Regions:
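Conserved phosphate-donor/acceptor-positioning beta-strand/loop module used by diverse small-molecule
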Residues: 78-83, 93-118, 148
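A conserved segment at the C-terminal end of the G1
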Residues: 1-12
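Short, well-ordered alpha-helical microsegments
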Residues: 86-89, 155-156
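NTP-dependent small-molecule kinase module
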Residues: 117-121, 135-178
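An amphipathic alpha-helix signature
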Residues: 107-112, 123, 153-156
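Conserved catalytic network of the ASCE P-loop NTPase/AAA+ motor domain
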Residues: 27, 70-73, 92-96, 137-140
């Protein structure tokens, strides 16, 4: 929701569509939410060094193709909706001029509540996300900005301020975006 809101207000911001080996959820669209690929194909791309970043998260791979990013940044600013592992890898590429924003829920219970309310994850996925919270939050200091994601409108206003201050490419990592 938040990335869509950013794109609606800022026409020059495009979402980097990641590749993943996981199955699509019922509401996801190929090429809009993710590019859904086989594990074999993903591993071939890794071997050929085609990714700016990739990570294995809960038994599935996610990654950002260099080609897609390089084509996008010629004309637009780009939003990466990725976790801390991806952000850490992308940070090595200075040409991307990242402004790193970490969105975090207030606490683990709120994360669990939002994941269940979103109704897009299995019980097992919710449990894994819940259990990884403490480890994930340890990486907050790798970011330029930390935003507590309590309210969508407040969160969006904070991101607007960051955009106006920086006018650069932005990486948004989060436990959950409403």
């Amino acid at each position: 929701t938040l990335t869509k809101k950013i794109q609606q207000k800022y026409q020059n911001f495009k979402l980097s569509v990641s590749l993943t080996t996981r199955s699509p959820r019922s509401n996801e669209v190929e090429g809009v939410d993710y590019h859904f690929v086989s594990r074999t194909y993903f591993e071939e791309l890794v071997a050929k060094k085609k990714f700016y970043e990739y990570a294995k998260i809960f038994e599935n791979y996610y990654g950002t193709l260099k080609k897609n990013v390089d084509e996008t940044i010629l004309k637009n600013d780009i939003i990466f909706d990725i976790d801390w592992q991806g952000t850490k890898q992308l940070s090595k590429f200075k040409n991307l001029n990242l402004i790193k924003i970490y969105l975090i829920t207030i606490n683990k219970e709120e994360l669990k509540k939002r994941l269940i309310k979103r109704n897009q994850n299995t019980k097992e996925e919710v449990k894994k996300r819940f259990n990884s919270f403490d480890d994930d939050i340890k990486h907050w200091n790798d970011y330029d900005y930390i935003i507590i994601n309590k309210n969508l409108d407040v969160c969006f206003k904070q991101i607007e301020k960051i955009i106006s201050l920086n006018k650069k490419r932005i990486s948004i990592s989060s436990h959950i975006i409403q």
